[in-house]
């Protein structure tokens, strides 16, 4: 970045804002890059501002211990500059009050009786012009100074809040909503930037009103209060409209949240929607919600319209109510009329615009300051003082709870009752989730480790393993007992955490760089081969959360970070959960057994191999110590427990989830059988029920129910019900997880992440955007590693983890920790912003847009709804009628040959009124001219309403049409298009852009149309009265158009860069929250504060430059029109044949043009910016419909296919058999991407069951997606002799029943989720739910089938969701069933239900199954082996077993033997089909065989 020119600019350059000229010139000529932005001035540095405010806040805390106020700290930092700019701003407003005095004297000089004053008219005109010049010179520096000050206040508060977050206790974080925290930083603090500029009007407006009332009293005496009274009533009317508008907006917010919740679920599960052919059903559901939302949107728009239009139409009434009563009683002169009109223009702006805006600004700002103040008062993480000489780690009878104790409860009650002030966030959350029982997550835990020992911690699900590590780190405060260790800790979290930055930055983590240690750690964690693949090696910049890495790569980088730090104690929370067996074993040996052999290690694990090699074992069950000792002691003291685990074949080769399930069940059985369960059981009974869980009887029934998930049965909800933000991995490494509720320990005990394939793959899990369910910060820390709005990396871009053998560290005598590195280190963070790194970290896929909105966008927007064209024509006709009436009035006046002038108001609607009114003031004609004036005013006022209200109404209708078209295009778009787009970016069109088009655009367009017509109409009238003014008007119009075009090219680019620069701030905030425990464990708070300040400085550089260029433009527009006013003034005065009425009209209109034009210019810029949202929406509307690409490709290759629309021989019963033939199938995720499947050919007989085999990433799931035509495909597939080229997409997909790994459950009733098209009766649905075992569960909910599920059906277990998917397949009556690892997340019971249902209900269907469980493949007759993107083998089981094929690599010896035995049994005579009613008994029998 270049140094900012403002630092070396002189006073003249700063006054006239000449210093931003280089960036404006560059932006006009070429596209601006981040490197083109200037560095921030030193006074705007986040470090300096935060230090200043933090110092004053600490001073406030010290001096005002009882009631410290943040506003006092802000006052001490910024008050004097704020006051200086306020005085400057009042001086500007004072000049506006003086201008009518000069105008009155100029008009008086044209009176025939005042010929002596005619000579001084030129001096008066010069004085009037100088007032405008002075106003322009002082206004813009004052406004810019206040905006700059508001920006500095926001930066300081941003930094203060971030520092507080890093200090906040984990208990408090569990009660803070993540969305509210982000809102605190964005919505509330953004009020300072623009709000400070108008804050001074809270005192300027009353002073101005008093001054103006005194000046108008001098003209109209006591009648001045008539106009003022009307303005006050108008302000009260606007306040009432504002209150009504807020009521409507509150009601609408619920509908918006409902619409966005379903929209986000649909977008994140778009492949499921397409597979089930639910596009039309989902569109109807959203449209129904949208209709209700739009009714409230119209009411909000009407309120805003009447509030805005009240300003435009109030001018006439104010003048009429003030002047008319005075005219009937006293003699009135034209000078008084025009002077009064000018005063009232200023008074109207002050009362109806400036003062209400200032009040609203102070209300919002003080509310934001109170929220921030309450946040800063929350409890902080307590830093414990440790004895650094301590060698051992000891814990004695420690008990701890994440809940609050009774004493704390009463303390809060007392404090709340005594203060009775603004509700504190903690209080509200605490009482809304109050529990009478304190539930210890750990109870009476004791152990002792000497230096160099390894402690392995294992336990049942939710037993408190991770909470134990949190307690050692000081994140969880013990309520009893003592903990002893040195405090030098390193930590590897359960969910791998990656910060934005390079790979090297993530491993070193701000410590000094030691090449030998770094190389040793990289090799030990098997990262060397991964790093060499990246183009920039370890300097490769990783995105937020490491979204470009696979789960295993993230896990190994997280482990390497922990190893690189030289600590006394290493806490490793399930660090190997994302790795395969071979890699895990190698890393365990190289890291824990060799590299860290002299260090004290605590490892959370569920593997027997780790327990055997550990020096000590700690087994936890429901927070209690089940066993502590060595492995040999475990075999002696707990023979039942150890024998059951050792008797489980290949226990360590199971997935982590299944191992946890087995451990949990084993603990339960052994605890009960050994009598240990008494204590544990009583403790277990104290656990709290979920806020949203079903009634107690539901849990009792479920215990004996067939559908019991042992993994989720022991889970606990936290004090505050939170939304889940699930872990996610990218790439080809196996990783699975249980996205369940919060566990008893508040730490997720699921030890595997969830695999993520490209979006087109329905079978691979993708997580729904949690639209409105509350997510606490603690949940974010414990459940998520990447943002839900994630980049879906293509599978080809991610490489499988390294499997190379590593260096034998046993042969090395050098200890990598022998040379201790500095904690703060020499790893310095450059103060200069590395914009390229930041840009890469937060890379966006936003397509390049035009610098400014094109005319084609405006034209398309206008023609979206033809009524808008008619309304715009109506507006133009009314405008021409108003101008024509004004000109007719002028003609009538000249025809009467009365030598008087005319007057005007500030709107084009009132121009003719002023003409007639001014003619009327003569010595004898009072009453009839008043009647004419009033009649004309009423009629033109009505025409103004006719013009504005239909415009706003029609613009809202256009918004409805755009949303409907965009939704339809997105739902009907091809999956190949979704593979290139972020889910979050699509959702932004429905959130941000739709809100802009609904709310902001209609009223902004109305303001712009109204203002531009006022200016144009005034110029027309002035030009008719004085044709010479055209000599000034035409050049001014040209200059204005050129200036606007010149400025917009740069400003829109700066606005875009500013928007992009805002992303790293919030991304860093979320990243810090996710890794807060890691940051604290490593003591890197100051390092992260510096990174946050760099992100703040980057945004400041963009925002400050935007404000500066905006002020450059606005000042030049003012200068141009001041020159225009000067020209018009002296032309009017220099003309000898004009009367005082014409001079009054010309000068009053010219003054009105100058004051109105700035507003009109700002509106035009706003409209151009808002239309960019319309442009983005159009790009999504233009997404080609699904099937168009395939159709075009086939048409190009084979013209005969053009005539094939639908096969005439297709019957309603198709497909009847389910026979499928695949010929030369090639599939790509994008039309221009590489082939992920190449020339696959095979055939499946009707009713046959085929198993898909292959390594992870071989293409099994891709094949299932290709069969459903979700990808860009070539080749041919036939079902029962019918080719897919002759069948519509919906018809083709309805031939398949699909059971994916992750089920799509949208917000809606059970019935809607099972049958969204409402094709089946309740009886048929109940029959199917009973068949799959869901009936008893659904009946336990209040409304049964009409019970509404929200947030992806979070209240249901994964088993229930899979059974719902099974029920959908039964209802679809499909003849071909596709299954992709449907049992990956299931407990044994639900697995048996699905297995039995497939065996009986789908006995006559063709089944294609991709599965890793041997038990699931027992029924398959044929196996398709995929390797290298093509079919390796397609044979029966016997041939695969006899040949040296890939099959032998996929399954072990015991698994192959089990398959062979099952196949022989299946090849014999089939058993008679049992009754479905026997399903439960059979499942219970098989459960005993498969549970262990």
Curated annotation (Swiss-Prot):
Span list, region Disordered: 1465-1492
Record topology, Cytoplasmic segments: 1-78, 148-196, 245-299, 360-867, 954-1004, 1049-1109, 1166-1492
Post-translation changes: Phosphorylated; cAMP treatment promotes phosphorylation and activates the channel. Dephosphorylation decreases the ATPase activity (in vitro). Phosphorylation at PKA sites activates the channel. Phosphorylation at PKC sites enhances the response to phosphorylation by PKA.
UniProt catalytic activity: ATP + H2O + closed Cl(-) channel = ADP + phosphate + open Cl(-) channel; chloride(in) = chloride(out); hydrogencarbonate(in) = hydrogencarbonate(out); ATP + H2O = ADP + phosphate + H(+)
InterPro entries xrefs: AAA+_ATPase, ABC1_TM_dom, ABC1_TM_sf, ABC_transporter-like_ATP-bd, ABC_transporter-like_CS, ABC_transporter_C-like, CFTR/ABCC7, CFTR_reg_dom
Known partners and oligomeric status: Monomer; does not require oligomerization for channel activity. May form oligomers in the membrane.
A GO CC term assigned to this protein in UniProt: membrane
Membrane topology, record value: Multi-pass membrane protein
Species this chain originates from: Squalus acanthias (Spiny dogfish)
Domain ABC transmembrane type-1: 82-366, 868-1169
Transmembrane segments: 79-99, 124-147, 197-217, 224-244, 300-320, 341-359, 868-888, 933-953, 1005-1025, 1028-1048, 1110-1130, 1145-1165
Binding site for ATP 1: 402, 435, 459-466, 494
Localization of this protein: Apical cell membrane; Early endosome membrane; Cell membrane; Recycling endosome membrane
Glycosylation sites: 905, 923
Protein name: Cystic fibrosis transmembrane conductance regulator
Stretches of the chain found on the membrane's Extracellular side: 100-123, 218-223, 321-340, 889-932, 1026-1027, 1131-1144
Main location: membrane
GO molecular function: ABC-type transporter activity; ATP binding; ATP hydrolysis activity; bicarbonate transmembrane transporter activity; chloride channel activity; chloride transmembrane transporter activity; intracellularly ATP-gated chloride channel activity
Protein family (similarity comment): Belongs to the ABC transporter superfamily. ABCC family. CFTR transporter (TC 3.A.1.202) subfamily.
Comp. bias (Acidic residues): 1481-1492
EC number: 5.6.1.6
Location of region: Disordered R region: 655-840
């Amino acid at each position: 970045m270049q140094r900012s020119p403002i630092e070396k600019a002189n006073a003249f350059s700063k006054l006239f804002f000449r210093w931003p000229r280089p960036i404006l010139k560059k932006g006009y000529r070429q596209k601006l890059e981040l490197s083109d932005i200037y560095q921030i001035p030193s006074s705007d540095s986040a470090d300096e501002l935060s230090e200043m405010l933090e110092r004053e806040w600490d001073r406030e805390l010290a001096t005002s211990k009882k009631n410290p106020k943040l506003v006092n700290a802000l006052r001490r930092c910024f008050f004097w500059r704020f006051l200086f700019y306020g005085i400057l701003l009042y001086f500007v407003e004072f000049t506006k009050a003086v201008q009518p005095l000069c105008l009155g004297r100029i008009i008086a000089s044209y009176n025939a009786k005042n010929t002596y004053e005619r000579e001084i008219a030129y001096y008066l005109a010069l004085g009037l012009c100088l007032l405008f010049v002075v106003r322009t010179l002082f206004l813009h520096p004052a406004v810019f100074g206040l905006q700059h000050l508001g920006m500095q206040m926001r930066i300081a508060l941003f930094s203060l809040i971030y520092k507080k977050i890093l200090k906040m206790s984990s208990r408090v974080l569990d009660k803070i909503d993540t969305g509210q925290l982000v809102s605190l930083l964005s919505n509330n603090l953004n009020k300072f930037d623009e709000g400070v500029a108008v804050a001074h009007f809270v005192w300027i407006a009353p002073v101005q009103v008093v001054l103006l009332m005194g000046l108008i009293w001098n003209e109209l005496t006591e009648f001045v209060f008539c106009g003022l009274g009307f303005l006050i009533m108008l302000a009260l009317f606007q306040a009432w409209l504002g209150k009504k508008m807020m009521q409507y907006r509150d009601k609408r917010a619920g509908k918006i949240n409902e619409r966005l919740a379903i929209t986000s679920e649909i977008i994140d599960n778009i492949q499921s929607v397409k597979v089930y052919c639910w596009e039309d059903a989902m569109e109807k559901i959203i449209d129904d919600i949208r209709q209700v939302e739009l009714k409230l949107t119209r009411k909000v728009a009407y309120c805003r319209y009447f509030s805005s239009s009240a300003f435009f139409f109030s001018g006439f009434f104010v003048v009429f109510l003030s002047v008319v009563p005075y005219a009937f009683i006293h003699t009135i002169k034209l000078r008084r009329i025009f002077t009064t009109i000018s005063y009232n223009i200023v008074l109207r702006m002050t009362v109806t615009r400036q003062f209400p805006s200032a009040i609203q600004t102070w209300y919002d700002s003080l509310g934001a300051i109170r929220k921030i103040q309450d946040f800063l008062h929350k409890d902080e993480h307590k830093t414990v003082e440790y004895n650094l000489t301590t060698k051992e780690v000891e814990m004695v009878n420690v008990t701890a709870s994440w809940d609050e104790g009774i004493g704390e409860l009463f303390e809060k009650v007392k404090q709340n009752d005594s203060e009775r002030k603004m509700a504190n966030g903690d209080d509200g959350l605490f009482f809304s989730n109050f529990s009478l029982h304190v539930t210890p997550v750990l109870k009476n835990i004791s152990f002792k480790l000497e230096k160099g020992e390894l402690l392995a911690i294992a336990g049942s699900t939710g037993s408190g393993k991770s909470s134990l590590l949190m307690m050692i780190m000081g994140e969880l405060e013990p309520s009893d007992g003592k903990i002893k260790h040195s405090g030098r800790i390193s930590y590897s979290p359960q969910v791998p955490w990656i910060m934005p930055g390079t790979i090297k930055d993530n491993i070193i983590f701000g410590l000094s760089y030691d090449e030998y240690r770094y190389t040793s750690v990289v090799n030990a964690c098997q990262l060397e081969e991964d790093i060499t693949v990246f183009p920039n090696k370890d300097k490769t910049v990783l995105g937020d959360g490491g979204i470009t890495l696979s789960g295993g790569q993230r896990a190994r980088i997280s482990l390497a970070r922990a190893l690189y730090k030289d600590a006394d104690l290493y806490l490793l929370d399930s660090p190997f959960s994302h790795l395969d067996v071979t890699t895990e074993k190698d890393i365990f040996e190289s890291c824990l057994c060799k590299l860290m052999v002299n260090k004290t290690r605590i490892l959370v694990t569920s593997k027997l191999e780790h327990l055997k090699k550990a020096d000590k074992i700690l087994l936890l069950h429901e927070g209690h110590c089940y066993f502590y000792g060595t492995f040999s002691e475990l075999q002696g003291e707990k023979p039942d427990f150890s024998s059951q685990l050792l008797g489980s074949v290949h226990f360590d080769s199971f997935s982590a989830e299944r191992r946890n399930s087995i451990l949990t069940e084993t603990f339960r059985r052994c605890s009960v059988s050994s009598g240990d369960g008494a204590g544990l059981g009583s403790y277990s009974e104290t656990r709290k029920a979920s806020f949203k869980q079903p009634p107690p009887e539901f849990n009792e029934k479920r215990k004996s129910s067939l559908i019991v998930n042992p993994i989720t049965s022991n889970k606990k909800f936290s004090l505050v019900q939170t939304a889940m933000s699930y872990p996610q991995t990218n790439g080809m490494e196996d990783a699975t997880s249980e996205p369940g509720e919060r566990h008893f320990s508040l730490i997720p005990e699921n030890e595997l992440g969830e695999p993520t394939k490209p979006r087109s793959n329905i079978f691979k899990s993708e997580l729904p955007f949690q639209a409105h369910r509350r997510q606490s910060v603690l949940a974010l820390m414990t459940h998520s590693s990447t943002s839900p709005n994630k980049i879906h990396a293509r599978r080809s871009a991610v490489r499988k983890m390294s499997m190379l053998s590593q260096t034998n560290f046993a042969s090395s005598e050098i200890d990598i920790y022998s040379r201790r590195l500095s904690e703060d280190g020499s790893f310095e963070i450059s103060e200069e912003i590395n914009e390229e790194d930041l840009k890469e970290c937060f890379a966006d896929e936003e397509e390049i847009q035009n610098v400014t909105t094109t005319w084609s966008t405006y034209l398309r927007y206008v023609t979206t709804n033809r009524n808008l064209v008619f309304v715009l024509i109506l507006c133009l006709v009314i405008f021409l009628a108003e101008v024509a009436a004004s000109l007719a009035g002028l003609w009538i006046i000249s025809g009467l040959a009365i030598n008087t002038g005319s007057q005007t108001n500030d709107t084009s609607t009132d121009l003719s009124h002023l003409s007639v009114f001014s003619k009327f003031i003569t010595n004898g004609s009072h009453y009839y001219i008043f009647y004419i004036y009033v009649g004309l005013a009423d009629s033109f006022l009505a025409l103004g309403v006719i013009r504005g209200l239909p415009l706003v109404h029609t613009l809202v209708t256009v918004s409805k049409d755009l949303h409907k078209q965009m939704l339809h295009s997105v739902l009907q778009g091809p999956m190949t298009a979704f593979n290139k787009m972020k889910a979050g970016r699509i959702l932004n069109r429905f959130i941000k852009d739709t809100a802009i088009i609904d709310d902001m655009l209609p009223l902004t367009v109305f303001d712009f149309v109204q203002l531009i017509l006022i200016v144009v109409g005034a110029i027309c009238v002035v030009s008719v009265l004085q044709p010479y003014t055209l000599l000034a008007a035409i050049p001014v119009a040209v200059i204005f158009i050129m200036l606007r075009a010149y400025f917009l090219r740069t400003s829109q680019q700066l606005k875009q860069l500013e928007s992009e620069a805002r992303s790293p701030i919030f991304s860093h905030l979320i990243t810090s929250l996710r890794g807060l425990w890691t940051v604290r464990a490593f003591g890197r708070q100051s390092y992260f504060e510096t990174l946050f300040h760099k992100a703040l400085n980057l945004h400041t550089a963009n925002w400050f430059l935007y404000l500066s260029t905006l002020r450059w433009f606005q000042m030049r527009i003012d200068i141009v029109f001041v020159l225009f006013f000067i020209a018009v003034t002296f032309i009017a005065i220099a003309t000898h044949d004009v009367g005082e009425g014409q001079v009054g009209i010309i000068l009053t209109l010219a003054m009105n043009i100058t004051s109105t034009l700035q507003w009109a210019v700002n509106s035009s810029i706003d409209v151009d910016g808002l239309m960019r949202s319309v442009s983005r929406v159009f790009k999504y509307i233009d997404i080609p419909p699904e099937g168009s690409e395939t159709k075009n490709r086939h048409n190009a290759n084979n013209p005969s296919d053009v005539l094939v629309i639908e096969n005439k021989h297709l019957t309603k019963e198709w497909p009847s058999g389910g026979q499928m033939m695949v010929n030369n199938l090639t599939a790509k995720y994008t039309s221009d991407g590489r082939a992920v499947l190449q020339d696959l050919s095979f055939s499946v007989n009707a009713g046959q069951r085929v198993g898909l085999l292959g390594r992870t990433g071989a293409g099994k799931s891709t094949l299932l997606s290709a069969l459903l035509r979700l990808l860009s495909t070539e080749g041919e597939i036939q079902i029962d002799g019918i080719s897919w080229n002759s069948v519509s997409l919906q018809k083709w997909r309805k031939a398949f029943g699909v059971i994916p790994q992750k089920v799509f459950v949208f917000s809606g009733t059970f019935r809607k989720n099972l049958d969204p098209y409402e094709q089946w009766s309740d009886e048929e649905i109940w029959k199917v739910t009973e068949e799959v075992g869901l009936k008893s569960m659904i009946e336990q909910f209040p409304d049964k089938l009409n019970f509404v599920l929200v947030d992806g059906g979070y209240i249901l277990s994964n088993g229930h969701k899979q059974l719902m998917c099974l029920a959908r397949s039964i209802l679809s009556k499909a003849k071909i069933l596709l299954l992709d690892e449907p049992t990956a997340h299931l407990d044994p019971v639900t697995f048996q239900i699905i297995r039995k249902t497939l065996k009986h209900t789908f006995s006559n269907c063709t089944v294609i199954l991709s599965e890793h469980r041997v038990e699931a493949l027992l029924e398959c007759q044929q196996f398709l082996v995929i390797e290298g993107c093509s079919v390796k083998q397609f044979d029966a089981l016997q041939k695969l077993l006899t040949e040296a094929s890939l099959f032998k690599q996929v399954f072990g010896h015991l698994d192959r033997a089990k398959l062979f035995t099952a196949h022989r049994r299946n090849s014999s005579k089939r058993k008679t089909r049992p009754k479905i009613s026997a399903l439960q008994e059979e499942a219970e029998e098989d459960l005993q065989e498969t549970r262990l």
